[in-house]
Design a protein with these regions (language model features):
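Conserved class I S-adenosyl-L-methionine
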Residues: 2-6, 11-60, 64-73, 76, 158-185
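A short glycine-rich, Lys/Arg-flanked "PGG" loop and its adjoining helix->strand segment in the class I
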Residues: 143-155
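A conserved beta-strand element that flanks and buttresses the S-adenosyl-L-methionine
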Residues: 129
Length: 264
């Protein structure tokens, strides 16, 4: 009976979504990730300068563009874009977590959920950035976002989905790698959702060369810098740190790769 039911593609897809929802809550929803863009290459001026330069060229971002960054963290990317292009319109970020250690310059950050922001504002945008954030929204939240954002973008607007590439070179310990692989698999479902609602125009990779000491990287793991580390027990973190110590050199050199997909 179950085999017959699963032959129905619509039902099978619903099962996949249900599984993905369980995965999201298991991996990500216990607490917000405060440290992903703090005190690491992920928050360095060089990192955001290189990403900003590539986005400006790839998306042809000009000074009159109106930009929204969903889940902007401390606003480093928006700030860099604003400085590089001298934007006429102050770019806007939406971030539910308020970071008291950071005062943004030349940008406006709203501390709320993206759906609350869209409900309470009538602003129109030319560019919407979704950098490693969609997996943190539930399916219902994403559905509402896909519906509501269409009322807040101009005719030729671009929606930019930026996510970790599945060929990552980031140093991992086994449990961390297992959880990350599960997370990366969910990107396919997110892409299906986006292509159901928007048209995929183009894509390319952003490659950043990282040089960091082993001790600095271990401290990032202790701070649970990735969402997949959030629900690990302290013992699991310490065991992971021992694995990294025993399997990597004192100076880490690797490439951090993001995939940039542009929808319209």
């Amino acid at each position: 009976m179950i085999k017959k039911v699963l032959k129905n593609n619509n039902y099978k897809k619903k099962c996949e979504y249900f599984f993905c929802e369980l995965l999201y809550f298991a991996l990500f929803m216990n607490s917000p990730c405060y440290n992903w863009d703090r005190s690491s290459w992920l928050s360095s001026k060089e990192y955001f300068q290189e990403l900003s330069n590539q986005l400006i060229d790839f998306l042809d971002i000009t000074e009159e563009k109106k930009i929204l960054d969903v889940g902007c963290g401390r606003g480093h990317l928006l700030e860099t874009l604003a400085l590089n292009i001298n934007l006429i319109n102050q770019p806007v970020g939406v971030e539910p977590v308020k970071h008291d250690d950071f005062i943004p310059q030349n940008i406006k950050i709203f501390h709320s959920s993206v759906n609350s922001f869209l409900n309470e504002n009538n602003s129109q945008f030319d560019l919407v950035i979704l950098k490693q954030v969609l997996h943190l929204l539930t399916l219902d939240e994403r559905k509402k976002f896909y519906h509501d954002i269409k009322n807040h973008i101009n005719e030729d607007a671009c929606i930019v989905f930026i996510h970790m590439n599945d060929q990552t070179e980031i140093p991992l310990f086994p449990l961390m790698e297992n959880k990350l692989n599960q997370s990366l698999k969910s990107h396919q479902l997110l892409l299906e959702e986006l292509t159901d609602n928007f048209h995929l125009m183009k894509f390319e990779n952003f490659n950043y060369n990282v040089k960091i000491s082993l001790e600095e990287y271990l401290e990032m793991i202790r701070n649970r810098y990735m969402t997949v580390l959030l629900d690990l027990k302290e013992k699991e973190i310490e065991e992971g740190i021992e694995f990294i110590k025993n399997n990597y050199s004192n100076q880490l050199v690797f490439q951090d790769t993001l995939t940039i997909k542009v929808f319209n």
